[in-house]
């Protein structure tokens, strides 16, 4: 989540940044869904539920992006979701994007979109069809001081039957909350513009997934050649090799 930022540089910062804030467990009452996507509240720890609650209770923006389609079959699709550092390496190898992911621990990654936003992405919960993320990062603009916001992303995905073209469809619910009072006031005034910027930035990430899936389907040999550089263990590298080999004609 450019030229469009020059008109409203303040609003661009809304999309990615995040920092945790304290929240009492007693106040964490989560809704059953976000933008129509079921929220896996019961699978969250008390502290993670507080993080989600403090964003979605009174967000600066709330938007839905998608559905976006990728031609990948489910096993490879889920592998790349579980190992975004491998997906980022493949995106660079296939000249799709230069985004960076670095694993910091279980379900925790350092992410840098190379567009002013960098920070920690956490996977809070996952099921067969939903994944809940919390993004904590810092965004820098040449026209404005660094800004922090807190972002909750809830993704829903489904496999399409061969009769519908196969592959996966994904929909993303994005909630942001700004901690800077000046920015928060401006967002309240320019809410429609802010929602449009957030949607555009989130759509960029969804399009990256679609473009990477298309590139892998077209160029599996080039993807296999990139395997030695993958920041993966031997077992994960072998698993990815198996998935990519299945893409060969």
Give names to the regions the model predicted.
Residues 100-152:
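Glycine-rich portal/gate segments that line the openings of hydrophobic small-molecule binding cavities
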Residues 8-19:
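Bacterial N-terminal signal peptides
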Residues 61-66, 73-76, 129-131, 151, ...:
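Envelope-exposed proteins and targeting segments
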Residues 1-5:
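N-terminal secretory signal peptides that target proteins for export/translocation
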Residues 87-110, 229-244:
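Short solvent-exposed beta->alpha transition segments
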Residues 26-44, 154-249:
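Terminal "cap-and-tail" regions of soluble proteins that handle hydrophobic small molecules
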Residues 86-87, 138-142, 177-181:
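Solvent-exposed loop/turn segments at secondary-structure junctions
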Residues 23-105:
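Hydrophobic ligand-binding cavity/cleft-lining segments
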């Amino acid at each position: 989540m450019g030229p469009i930022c020059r008109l409203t540089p303040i609003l661009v910062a809304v999309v990615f940044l995040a920092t945790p804030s304290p929240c009492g467990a007693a106040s964490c009452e989560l809704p059953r869904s976000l933008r129509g996507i079921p929220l896996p509240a019961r699978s969250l720890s008390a502290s993670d539920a507080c993080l989600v609650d403090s964003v979605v209770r009174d967000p600066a923006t709330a938007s839905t992006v998608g559905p976006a389609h990728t031609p990948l079959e489910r096993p490879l699709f889920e592998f790349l979701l579980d190992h975004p550092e491998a997906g980022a390496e493949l995106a660079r190898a296939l000249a799709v994007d230069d985004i960076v992911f670095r694993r910091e621990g279980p379900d925790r990654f350092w992410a840098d979109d190379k567009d002013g936003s960098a920070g920690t992405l956490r996977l809070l919960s996952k099921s067969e069809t939903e994944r809940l993320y919390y993004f904590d990062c810092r965004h820098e603009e040449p026209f404005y001081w660094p800004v922090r916001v807190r972002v909750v992303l809830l993704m829903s995905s489904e496999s399409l039957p061969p009769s519908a073209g196969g592959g996966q469809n994904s929909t993303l619910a994005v909630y942001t909350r700004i901690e800077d009072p000046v920015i928060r006031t401006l967002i309240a005034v320019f809410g429609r513009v802010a929602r449009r910027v957030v949607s555009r930035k989130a759509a960029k990430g969804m399009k990256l997934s679609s473009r990477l899936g298309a590139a892998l389907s077209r160029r599996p040999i080039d993807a296999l050649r990139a395997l030695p550089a993958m920041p993966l263990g031997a077992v994960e590298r072998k698993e990815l090799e198996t998935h990519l080999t299945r893409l060969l004609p």
